[in-house]
A protein has these predicted regions:
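An N-terminal assembly and electron-transfer interface module characteristic of large anaerobic redox
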Residues: 1-166
């Protein structure tokens, strides 16, 4: 939709999300994705068969997708344990130290390979370990930001504080 004003007016009254229902599996999926990304990048720079790591990553993403659709958080944790074993089995016996590089910048650039000119692929092809950007801290930071904004009277909330308390 196109707007000339300062906000995007795209009201869709029939589209409602039950956050209480989807938040647990969404958070589990985000943690799984972050962990799988770390496993992939730590492995791919240390092995000669880069395709094996990519295939393994794709396989685990497909398996996780099925579990997300069933909202099976416990099975996702078991799948992650299996992924750790599988990625570890690809590694050589001797520990190979690699240079490490993190991808920083605007979130869109960090997560969009075309926007960042496929820098992660280039780095891994040159046996440099990519410290991938994580989605979990990006989203959990909003809880910290919320507290700071409330304390500084920059935000009013209709949501009870116990929802956000630890």
């Amino acid at each position: 939709s196109v707007t000339m004003g300062g906000d995007l007016n795209n009201n869709q009254p029939g589209f409602k999300l039950n956050w209480v229902k989807i938040l647990p599996i969404a958070f589990s999926a985000m943690l799984f994705g972050d962990s799988l990304s770390k496993l992939y990048y730590a492995t791919v720079c240390r092995i000669s068969d880069k395709k094996a790591a990519k295939d393994l990553q794709s396989s685990y993403l497909q398996k996780a997708k099925a579990l997300v659709l069933k909202s099976d958080r416990k099975a996702m944790l078991q799948l992650l344990a299996s992924a750790v074993e599988s990625f570890n089995s690809l590694l050589p016996k001797e520990r190979l130290e690699r240079k490490k590089v993190g991808i920083v910048g605007e979130i869109f650039l960090k997560f969009h390979s075309f926007a960042n000119k496929n820098i992660a692929s280039w780095l891994t092809e040159h046996d440099i370990e990519v410290l991938p950007p994580m989605l979990t801290p990006f989203f959990t930071q909003s809880f910290v930001n919320r507290d700071a904004k409330l304390q500084n009277n920059l935000l009013k909330s209709n949501i009870p504080d116990f929802v956000f308390s630890q």
